[in-house]
């Protein structure tokens, strides 16, 4: 195949480029900095004043922490979309649980609700 078909075309607009350049210019590339602090404070204010908000480095880290906080442990089964990047399932394995992959609908690419129901009842 000579021509790549992108599922989602890569794109970075002017705003993203500005913030990336600002991070390099101020040497706040990782792990934290004023943009992360502003994001956390803004999200905390939007959601609630009584809870803490923490920005993480990736969706994988967020799923990992969510599984731990939900009490998922070794031997548990966790339903997982089959049409995904491996990083969606890796945290399930990190906590010792078993990913159970649910296939997608061909017209939406979303998890098939019928197959989801079957997996829950199984």
Predicted segments with their positions:
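Phosphate-binding glycine-rich loop
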Residues: 32-77, 91-93, 101-103
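N-terminal "arm"/small-domain region of PLP-dependent enzymes with the aminotransferase-like
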Residues: 1-30
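PLP-dependent aminotransferase-like
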Residues: 68, 72-122
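Alpha-helix N-cap/helix-start motif at coil-to-helix transitions, marked by capping-box chemistry
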Residues: 10-14, 37, 86
């Amino acid at each position: 195949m000579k021509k790549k078909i992108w599922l989602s075309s890569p794109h970075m607009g002017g705003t993203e480029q500005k913030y990336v350049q600002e991070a390099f210019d101020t040497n706040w590339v990782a792990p934290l900095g004023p943009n992360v602090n502003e994001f956390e404070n803004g999200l905390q204010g939007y959601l609630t004043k009584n809870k803490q908000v923490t920005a993480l480095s990736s969706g994988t880290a967020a799923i990992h922490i969510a599984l731990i906080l939900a009490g998922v442990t070794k031997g548990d089964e966790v339903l997982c979309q089959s049409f995904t990047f491996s990083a969606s399932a890796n945290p399930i394995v990190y906590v010792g649980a078993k990913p159970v992959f649910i296939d997608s609908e061909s017209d939406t690419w979303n998890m098939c609700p019928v197959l989801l129901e079957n997996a829950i009842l199984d």
